[in-house]
Amino acid sequence: MGASVLPLGLGAGDCQSSSGRRMSACLPRTALSFLLSLLLATPGARAAGYETCPMVQPGMLNVHLVAHTHDDVGWLKTVDQYYWGIHNDLQQAGVQYILDSVISALLAEPTRRFVYVEMAFFSRWWHQQTNETQEVVRRLVRQGRLEFANGGWVMNDEAATHYGAIVDQMTLGLRFLEDTFGSDGRPRVAWHIDPFGHSREQASLFAQMGFDGVFFGRIDYQDKLVRKKRREMELVWRASASLKAPAADLFTGVLPNNYGPPEGLCWDVLCADPPVVDDPRSPEYNAKKLVSYFLQLATAQGRYYRTNHTVMTMGSDFQYENANTWFKNLDKLIQLVNMQQANGSRVHVLYSTPACYLWELNKANLTWPVKEDDFFPYADGPHMFWTGYFSSRPALKRYERLSYNFLQVCNQLEAQVGPAANVGPYGHGDSSPLNQAMAVLQHHDAVSGTSKQHVADDYARQLAAGWGPCEVLLSNALAKLSGSKETFLFCRDLNISICPFSQTSERFQVLVYNPLGRKVDRMVRLPVRKGLFLIKDPGNNTVPSTVVELTSSGNPELLFPALVPALGFSVYSVTRVSDQNPQTRSQHSRPQKYSSPVLSIKNEYLRASFHPDTGLLSMIEVLDRKLTLPVNQAFFWYNASVGDKRSSQASGAYIFRPSQQWPFPVSHLARTRLVKTALVQEVHQNFTAWCSQVVRLYSGQRHLELEWTVGPIPVGDKWGKEIISRFDTPLETGGVFFTDSNGREVLERRRDYRPSWKLNQTEPVAGNYYPVNSRIYITDGKMQLTVLTDRSQGGSSMSDGSLELMVHRRLLKDDGRGVGEALQEPGSGGWVRGRHLLLLDTAREAAAEHRLLAEKELLAPQLVLAPGQGPSYHHDHHEAVPRKQFSGLRRQLPPSVRLLTLARWGPDTLLLRLEHQFALGEDSSRNLSLPVTLDLQDLFSTFTITRLQETTLAANQLRASASRLKWTTEIDPISRPAVPRLDPSSITLQPMEIRTFVASVQWEENS
C-alpha cells in the first residue's frame, strides 16, 4: 500500500524479440553484450555481503541513498495485473518492466545500487529471462549492486498473520534466493517498510531466521515524535520474554520518511518534482538550489540519529518502471553534493543499501536503547488509528486460516508417503500451488483485508486453485497408507453445513486425519438427511451418535465422537438405518426440547446458564474446580464515523473510528431454542434476522463453544456498522488485558497506555484495539477468562472485567488510504460464520488449557469422505484388508511440543520443525513450561532419518555456521550460548524455542 497517492505518469515501453519473447532487460542484444563485458571487467567482483559495501567518509555525515521499489503483491490490482502491467487505469504499475529497467540502469553505471524485496514477483520475472540475462543478474548480486532485502515471498502483514504462515512464506522466498544465488543472495536485513504496525513476534522470527536487523517506515505519530526527540529512532528490540537474549534480539531502525523520498526529490515518472537541471545556461537551472536544500535536509535529519550515518529511501510504490529517470538524477545529486566538500561541506552522499547502512551502524560500536513491547496500535494522526483492518474481510481471514490447516495436512502426507503422494492413481498431486497461494495471502494488503474487492476475490481464487492439487495429493497418499483406492471426496463447505455427498448417501466412510503430534478426540459434524445412523469405528465397534437440526439452514447434522491417533487417521463407517434397528436405538440419542424456566446446558465439567427473560448467556460454572463467574455475552455494533467536527477521518478498511464511545446492542434479547442430547447440549439464540448464535457444550469438553453467524449487515439506515461480541464479568482487572502476538507469545495490554511513551489518547475505542490472532484474556490473578478465535480479529477490554472482539464490519465510506472503495463486501463475503471458544479456569492452570486448545483449533482434523469398498491399492495383494487406522508416529509428542512443520524439502529430504509451545513460567500446574527433550530416532513410522542437519528458522543457513552482528545495549551484556552439539536421540527444546532440521530420509516400502 502506498505512503501517499501519487500523480500517475507513463511507464517505460515494452520491447520484444522477433519471436515475441521479452528480451533481457529490454536491451538490444548488442547493448546487453557490451554492458555485460563492462560488468565482467568491473573491479571488485567479490562475494556478496557486507564486504561489498561502498566506502564511506569518516568524520562526515554519510547519507545512504537507498534506491528501491515497493511492489505490493496485490492491492488496487491483482498480482497478475501488477506483474504484467494490466489495468493501468487503476494504477500505473508493471513489475516486469520495473525489473527490466532497473537491471539496464545498474549495468549502465557501476556505482549504482538497488534493493528488491518481493520474491513472488522476482521469481516469476527470473524464470522468464534468458540464460545470458540471468548470468548478468547473478554478477550484480555477487557484487552487492542488486541487493535483496527481506527475501520473503511477500512483505507480510504483522497484525492478521499467524506465525506458522509467516515462517512458511519467508521460507519459500528465502529458499528461492538460496537455490538461485547461493549465499550471495541471502538477505542480511529485514525490510518491513509498509505494514501498519509491527508485532514483537515478527521481530523474534526475523532474529531466529538470522537477520541482523529490520527497518520499517510506519510507527505511531506520537511514538515517532518522542523517538526523534530522544534520538531513539534506532534501537535493539528484545522480542521474546522466553528466549534467552540475544536469540530474539533484533536491531530495529525507523526510517525518517516512511519509505518514500524526501519532499521535492522524487524523480520517478509517477512524480511531478522537477529534475536536476545542472546546466547554468538553462533558465530552468536549479542545481545550486537543490544542493543547498539537500544539505539542509541531511543535516536536519541527521540530528535525530546517533551516528554520522543517515538513510534516505529513494523510491516508493511501483517506481523505477523507467529507472533511468531516477538514477540519472541521483547520479547528478551525488556528484553535486559531494563537490561541496571542497567548500567545507561535511556531507557525503553515496548509493547504498539497507545492509550496508546497518553495517556502518554496527561498526559505530554504540550502546543502543532496548524495546521490549511492540508497535501496536499504529496511528498516523489523532483520529486515525489503523485498527479496523484487524477485522476487515472476516470471510477471507477465515479462508486463509482454513487453508493453512489444509496445507499442513497436505505437507505432512506428502512427507510421510514420499513420491507416491505426487504421482499415483488419482493423478499428479502437488503442494506447491497452495503453498504459494498461502504465501501470497500473507501480504500486508491480502489477509489484512485492505485491497479492492476484485483483488480480494482473486486472493480467494488463488487459494481455491491451490486446494485442488493438494486434494489429489491427499488421495494418492491416503490410498497408499490405507491400502484402498477409494473415491475420496472433500467437502469444502462444511462450515456452512453443506456436503452433497453425505446429504444424499445411505452408506459412506469418514476418514478423519489428525495433523497433531498427539491423539485427538473430536466431535465429527456432517450434514445429512433426516433419519437414524449407525456409526462403526475402526475396530467395528458401534459409536454413539445423534442428529441435530439446525434452525439457520434447516439441514440436520450428524454428530459422533472420533478418536484419531497422532499424525494419522481413523476410518469410520456411516450407515443410514431404519428406526426399528435395536442397535441403532441404543446408541442413537434423540434431541430433546425443554421448557424449564432455568435455561442452562451442562456436562461433567461445565454449566452455562442463560437469563430466562433475555435468553443471553449469564453465568459459567466450572464444576470440578468450583469456579463460578457471571459472564454476560451479547452482540453490539459501533456506528462507523464518516467524519465529524474533530476530524474528517472516516472508518474504513484500514481505520476504525466509531462515531461514539459506547456501542448499540444488536438486540436486548434473543429468541432461544434448547437442544439436549447425550453428546451435545446447545442453546440456539436468534438476535435479529442477520445475527444469531449457537452456544454449544459437547460431552467431555472443558470449554464453551459460541458459533456466531453475522450478516449481511443492514445499512439501509445509511449507517456503517462494526459488529462486536462482548463478554462482561465482575472481574477486577485494573484496565489490563492480554493478547497473543501472531498466535505465539502473549503481551500485556493496558487501557489508554503505551509502555514506550506517555499516550495522549484521542480515540478511546479505536486507540485501545489490538490484533488478536488466537486468544485474548482477562484475569484478576485468581480466575482467568480466555476467548480463543478461529481467525484474526481486533479486540480490547473497554472496561474492567470486559472483553470484546470485532467479528464483522460493513462501511459506507472509504477511509482515504488509497483503496478508493468502501468496505461493502457484496455477495457471500457479507455473510460470515465463526466460532469463539470460551475458557474459564484458575489463573494458574489456564495456560495449559488455552495453549493446547489453540493448537487443536489451528490444526483441526481433516475429514475425507468415500463410498467405501474401493479396490486394493496393492496390485499383488488383492486379499489385503484395508487399514482403518494409522499413526505416522511410533510414540506421541509431549503436550508442550508442537510439530510445526513436516514437509518435503527435496527428492529424499524433509523439512522438520519442532517447537516448545509454552512460554517461560507460563504453566506451573503441569510443568509444561519446563525444557523438554525428544528422541527423533525411530520416531516416524513411514520413514527412517538417515542424516539430520540443523538450520536457522527459515532453513536457508546451517545453524552451526550462522552468525549475526553483535550489538551493545543499555541492559547488561548478554552471554551468547554456544550451538549445542546435534544428537538426534536428544533434541532439547527450551520454552518458546523452535528448532528446524533438514532430514535425509528413506521411506519404508510398505508404509
Curated annotation (Swiss-Prot):
Glycans are attached at residues 131, 308, 343, 365, 495, 540, 639, 686, 760, 927. Residues 1-47 form the signal peptide. Its EC number is 3.2.1.24. Keywords: Disease variant, Disulfide bond, Glycoprotein, Glycosidase, Hydrolase, Lysosome, Metal-binding, Signal, Zinc. InterPro entries: Gal_mutarotase_sf_dom, GH38_C, Glyco_hydro/deAcase_b/a-brl, Glyco_hydro_38_C, Glyco_hydro_38_cen, Glyco_hydro_38_cen_sf, Glyco_hydro_38_N, Glyco_hydro_38_N_sf. The keyword Glycoprotein applies. It catalyses: Hydrolysis of terminal, non-reducing alpha-D-mannose residues in alpha-D-mannosides. SMART domains: Alpha-mann_mid (SM00872). One of its GO terms (molecular function) is carbohydrate binding. The keyword Secreted does not apply. Binds 1 zinc ion per subunit. GO terms for biological process: mannose metabolic process. GO terms for cellular component: lysosome. Pfam families: Alpha-mann_mid, Glyco_hydro38C2, Glyco_hydro_38C, Glyco_hydro_38N, Laman-like_dom. Zn(2+) binds at residues 70, 72, 194, 444. The active site is at residue 194. Disulfide bonds join 53-356, 266-271, 410-470, 491-499. It is linked to Defects in MAN2B1 are the cause of lysosomal alpha-mannosidosis (AM). AM is a lysosomal storage disease characterized by accumulation of unbranched oligosaccharide chains. Necessary for the catabolism of N-linked carbohydrates released during glycoprotein turnover. Belongs to the glycosyl hydrolase 38 family. This is Lysosomal alpha-mannosidase. It comes from Cavia porcellus.
